[in-house]
Amino acid sequence: MNKVRNLSVDELKQEQIHLINDIYALAKSKGLSNDDIEPIPDGVNDLEAYVKSNPRVMWVLKEPYDNFKTDGTPCDGGWNLFDAFDKDDAWTNRSWQPIIYILKGIFDKLLSWDDMDWIRDDKTMTELLKRIAYINVSKMPGM
């Protein structure tokens, strides 16, 4: 039986950078990426927190959301999902709100909504988004 070697946090960071570069290269080679649209990479924001986390959580999503042209075709991308978590208004994103509440329940072992603060009252709950893994099935915005 093969023994699995645990990677260090630095090795994981390098692997994540390598995967992100591969995503950009593949999108370009397949004609999915151009001046109007680029991939939005996924992965883990805070690898140290993720490695220490118990349990380790990975959230699988359909696709990243971004802007659309007037004809309805997706555009933009090229931004980092993790940078969005550092914004003061990150908690207002409706896609992330249920994720935040579920993570709060998991990590703080809360079984009732009544035991939780509202995100608007405790914006630090948004920090939970940084310690899990994200996988978008499609890396392209709104496709």
Where are these regions (language model features)?
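A polyanion-binding, active-site-adjacent surface
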Residues: 2-143
